[in-house]
A protein has these predicted regions:
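A generic structural motif
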Residues: 131, 144-146, 218-220
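Short, mixed charged/polar active-site loops
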Residues: 136-138, 151, 244-247
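Metal-dependent nuclease catalytic regions and adjoining charged, substrate-binding loops involved
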Residues: 185-193, 197-272
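Short histidine-centered catalytic/ligand-binding loop motif
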Residues: 68, 177-189
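Conserved catalytic cores of phosphodiester-cleaving nucleases, focusing on short active-site segments
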Residues: 80, 139-165, 172-178, 199
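Internal, charge-rich low-complexity segments
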Residues: 33-40, 160-170
Length: 272
């Protein structure tokens, strides 16, 4: 069975006879957090006299939000491509005193990414495509390193901020994710933590001899030269490329109990 990813449409498919409906890890996690209703929020913001969007039409607000989203996506794609390109310039790299081969992603001439053999040898895997057929669950980890019997995963994030707590209401109560992970605050750091933990779970399922090691988020912040009319940053460019201001590391725990609960929920609720 070959599992593939098509960038256009962001589609995962396989050539097996089971006709699996694949679910990406990010989409799966999205099931357990409140959905953002952009149209409803734009309408509300337009009428709120204390909002910076007051007096603008719903369409103008939505267009401003979409422009900012596309700007952020562009920065994220640039950084991911830059890191992958830099890594693939080498055949090997030293990690924890060991010289490891760099394993390149399998991409066809048509730009389709093919998932590799899931039994992993010691090495560094940029943009590793992982999947678990039994669940129909798949995803792509920015950087996986298999070294000294451990699975180390790093993911790059370029969004404006990393929030460590959910929204706090006037009673001091923070918003939570949905059951079965309603013990976690609904914030993007916890979303990322679950994402990396599920990647680790999938890899370990195929490689039971390995232990789960470091799970790291690299949060990349870019320099800005000012802000636009809506208060969004205008990125500083140097020689035609975004200028990086800071990279902050978040070392995250493996959320074993939460992942086990999510996997159990998925098995019970998965629609094949």
């Amino acid at each position: 069975m070959a599992v593939i990813f098509k960038e256009e449409g962001h589609v995962y498919e396989s050539n097996d006879q089971d006709k699996i409906n694949w679910t990406s890890v990010t989409s799966f996690i999205g099931m357990f957090k409140p959905k953002f209703d952009a149209k409803a929020q734009a309408k509300k913001s337009s009428k709120n006299k204390r909002s910076k969007w007051h007096g603008m039409t719903d369409k103008e607000i939505l267009n401003a939000w979409d422009t900012e989203t596309q700007r952020a996506i562009g920065l994220g794609n640039w950084y991911h491509n830059q890191r992958e390109s830099d890594m693939l310039d080498f055949e090997t790299i030293a990690r924890e005193g060991v010289e490891l081969p760099i394993v390149k992603p399998d991409i066809t001439d048509e730009g389709v990414k093919v998932a590799p053999e899931q039994k992993l040898k010691d090495g560094v895997y940029p943009e590793l495509f992982v999947y678990l057929k039994s669940l129909g669950l798949c995803g792509q980890a920015d950087l996986v390193e298999i070294v000294n019997g451990e699975i180390n995963i790093t993911d790059y994030k370029t969004n404006k901020e990393v929030k460590e707590k959910g929204f706090t209401n006037w009673e001091g109560i923070t918003s939570k994710m949905f059951n079965p992970v309603n013990n976690l605050d609904d914030c993007n750091l916890n979303h990322y933590n679950l994402q990396l933990s599920i990647y680790a779970y999938i890899i370990k399922k195929h490689n039971p001899r390995l232990k789960i090691g470091k799970l790291v988020i690299q949060h990349v912040k870019f320099q800005k030269v000012g802000e636009n009319d809506h208060g969004y940053p205008i990125t500083k460019m140097v020689n035609g490329e975004p200028a990086i201001e800071e990279i902050k590391m978040y070392n995250l725990p493996y959320l074993k109990d939460e992942v086990d609960n999510l996997i159990m929920w998925f098995k019970d609720n998965k629609k094949c």
